[in-house]
């Protein structure tokens, strides 16, 4: 948003230098979706332990799916200026690839504000749970490539991220 003079952007979440949650009560609820991704890059010893089923804390892929679903529903507790919204659907996919573990989330709502933060939180929480469950195998595990892939709905319209190759 810009100020009436067109000089500088107007901060929507700060008034008089103080943070606030933007009032969305006048906005009509609309259907909105967001898809996000993250990567967990595995050193050889972590990948070997995962493939051999010798991970100290159990199956990190199953736990990551559940953690991502929970993360999508708890976003407003973690992101201070994020509105609590009804998550009407959430899917978290956790797949072992050559480059590491690829995590995607698709989150949907019918609300006056979007679900981008819920999708990003889902993949981030899932990735952190993978790290936690595999950290005994190596401290060189990396969480990488967290990004919004797409969104639909809302005043700002649809968004589609540029394609890029999988993480190294």
UniProtKB/Swiss-Prot annotation:
UniProt-listed CDD domains: MoaC_PE (cd01420)
Superkingdom as given in the UniProt entry: Bacteria
Pathway where this protein functions: Cofactor biosynthesis; molybdopterin biosynthesis
Reactions catalysed according to its record: (8S)-3',8-cyclo-7,8-dihydroguanosine 5'-triphosphate = cyclic pyranopterin phosphate + diphosphate
Protein name (Swiss-Prot/TrEMBL): Cyclic pyranopterin monophosphate synthase
Gene Ontology biological process terms, A to Z: Mo-molybdopterin cofactor biosynthetic process
EC identifiers of the protein: 4.6.1.17
Quaternary structure note: Homohexamer; trimer of dimers.
Protein family: Belongs to the MoaC family.
Function: Catalyzes the conversion of (8S)-3',8-cyclo-7,8-dihydroguanosine 5'-triphosphate to cyclic pyranopterin monophosphate (cPMP).
Origin organism lineage: Bacteria, Thermotogati, Deinococcota, Deinococci, Deinococcales
SUPFAM superfamilies, per database record: Molybdenum cofactor biosynthesis protein C, MoaC
Molecular function GO labels: cyclic pyranopterin monophosphate synthase activity
Gene (UniProt): moaC
Signal peptide (from-to): none
Organism: Deinococcus radiodurans (strain ATCC 13939 / DSM 20539 / JCM 16871 / CCUG 27074 / LMG 4051 / NBRC 15346 / NCIMB 9279 / VKM B-1422 / R1)
Active-site residue list: 132
Annotated residues for binding of substrate: 81-83, 117-118
Keyword terms of this UniProt record: Lyase, Molybdenum cofactor biosynthesis
NCBIfam families: moaC, PRK09364.1
InterPro entries on file: MoaC, MoaC_bact/euk, MoaC_sf, MoCo_biosynth_MoaA/MoaC, Mopterin_CF_biosynth-C_dom
